[in-house]
Amino acid sequence: GIQQFWVVFFLFFMTGIAIVLYLNQTPSQPRERDYAYAGSFYAFAIWIGMGVAGIIRLLQHYAKMKELPAAAIVSVACLFVPIQMASQTWDDHDRSGRYVARDFGQNYLMSLQETGNPIIYTNGDNDTFPLWYNQETEGFRTDARTCNLSYLQTDWYIDQMKRPAYDSPSLPITWDRMEYVEGTNEYVPVRPEYKKSIDALYAEAEKQALSGNTEALVNVKKEFGENPYELKNILKYWIRSKNEDLKVIPTDSIVMKVDKEAVRRSGMMIPGDSIPDYMHISLKGKRALYKSELMMLEMLAEANWERPIYIAVSVGPENQLNMGNHFIQEGLTYRFTPFDTDKLGVKIDSEKMYDNLMHKFKFGGIDKPGIYIDENAMRMCHSHRRIFSQLAQQLIREGKKDKAKAALDYAEKMIPAFNVPYDWQNGAVQMAEAYYQLGDSTKADDMMKVLADKAVEYLTWYLSMDDNRFSISTREFEYHWAVLDAEVKIMKKYNSKLAEIYAPKVEELYNLYAERYERLQKMEKK
């Protein structure tokens, strides 16, 4: 009856739509939120069952059928609905033979040093949960600690990080809970304008000390430390100060004294012929550091290079604390080092990275034909292909051509194009260029042809659109045209015969675009 309808209706409404209204979900969610409607699916299933009973009654009433035959016919007919759904979408949901979540999570952990209880900073779901699964369920690399920077802004998560977990000791955080409890030190302003006054204060104190009066110098060093811009002193005398007026960072260029012996013992690659006395951390462009960033500085200061600290390659620059110029890549991770790797021109530890990629990494079955790879897994496949291309280029620069060729061939074997198509943005172009540099023009040409054909296909498709669709797709056309043009330049650079085929297409397609674009502009003015 109508009463039962309203019971099911409100179950349907309150377990789905009402939850979304209550949570006030913002538009453009990072992923589909189907699980918010899980309860509604149960309620709708009740309606489906009631609907089947209703169809049976209709057959009894209008077709004058008995209950059992009517029920049998309706049941068989209704079975075609899930069968049809399964036949059309089974392949989109079939994960059999695919273990990328587990294996790629292990690859992050295998990119860490095997000793020293390393720390890895992550940020998003897809570079955190697979690591947690491997550590919590598989018992893999329980000596390492995964630290999610998104959660590090909260007091409860810092509490967790200060406790040991499995074979990993607590993270090197010395702050008392009252210093990071919610509402405290949520952010600390960066005030480089203070530097002038502080420099003047130290200069005056040193001047008095030269005259025999050392009291002022003793007091100022007692207040702000030997060097007020050194990381440990900033943490101690400014950020953690009891004086609220001093809870600032008085410079946008922090220095950190380097324990050279600890660096030598750490196991990190030492580029160049010396270890710097100080590490420089630039905060230029930042007006404040948030709690998670303060914790990163605290751990860097307290670890003192004795505990390896890494950050996942999937963490964006906005969460790297402007320290990208101190990173050395060892796989799917960047390692924090005291070196300015930009100035030294060394961004990759090729020996460690080669060992990790060639001997330790797993690929979750993506080398097998027919494996279904959704967009999330595909992004990680792209990341793996990119790091292979980066490794190959570094090995070529170091003159290790045999290893570079082996790395490229292994990437082709484990990340094949039939499952992970070549694309301008996923490292395929860099791999093709590396093959050219290694003298394997046949393989390079094969890759470049696929890439160029893909660009031509897109450009031809845009030109086939009607005027309305074409006018809103001009930016995409220009992107793919720029891609094709760049690919042709690479072909010409390495004297590939493919240039003779695709160079005319670059000009031809652009002329067609320019003519049509100009015509549309004139039509708009009219």
Language model regions located:
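ER/secretory pathway lumenal C-terminal domains and tails of membrane proteins involved
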Residues: 1-37, 44-117, 129-526
